[in-house]
Regions:
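Short beta-strand edge/turn micro-motifs at domain boundaries
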Residues: 142-166
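Sec-dependent N-terminal signal peptides
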Residues: 6-11
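C-terminal motif of bacterial Sec signal peptides marking the signal peptidase cleavage site
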Residues: 13-16
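A short gly/proline-enriched turn/hairpin at secondary-structure junctions
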Residues: 32, 64, 70-81, 95, ...
Length: 166
């Protein structure tokens, strides 16, 4: 029994001490390549969207999305056109007067092999964001938000967003 515990402890220690090198640069995609990157044009695009959202810069935010981009938030069962979502954001921000701070988001872009033609060339962007909002009355709220983006040819095709709506 002691030997089994010692072997398990040794194996755990060995695996805990070895960490794979983080891949930080890959912008090419083919049917057999996979990558996860923390920098590059797709990450810059996500940063641009989050910065524009936080600043209420709706025109800049709109330029990041394709003309046919769709948006789902939380348990939406039907996608909303991104242009309609941005208009909704604009109206909500105008009425609430919120000042939004995105903090320091964590971004990644994942590329995976596919044989499905509808996903060819798409990269999957992910962002974890701790939003802090302050209303014009001074009330503050925080929301941990996860966003998944489908990105192709320098534009976002869709966003799926998960956050606590309370």
């Amino acid at each position: 029994m002691k030997k089994t515990i010692l072997v398990a402890l040794f194996a755990t220690t060995l695996f805990a001490c070895s960490t794979p090198a983080e891949k930080t640069a890959s912008t090419t995609t083919d049917a057999t390549a996979s990558s996860c990157v923390k920098e590059g044009p797709e990450v810059d695009l996500m940063k641009k969207v989050v910065t524009a959202y936080s600043a209420g810069d709706w025109a800049t935010m709109a330029t990041c999305f394709s003309d046919t981009a769709k948006s789902w938030h939380n348990n939406d069962t039907v996608a909303m056109k991104m242009s309609d979502r941005i208009e909704m954001f604009k109206q909500l921000r105008a009425s609430a007067g919120d000042v939004v701070d995105a903090g320091t988001p964590n971004y990644e872009v994942v590329t995976v092999p596919t044989t499905d033609s509808q996903y060819e060339g798409i990269k999957w962007g992910h962002a974890w964001i701790n939003f802090k909002s302050t209303s014009k009355t001074g009330e503050t709220s925080k929301s941990l938000t996860f966003v998944s983006f489908g990105i192709k040819d320098g534009k976002i095709l869709y966003e799926q967003v998960i956050y606590d709506a309370k």
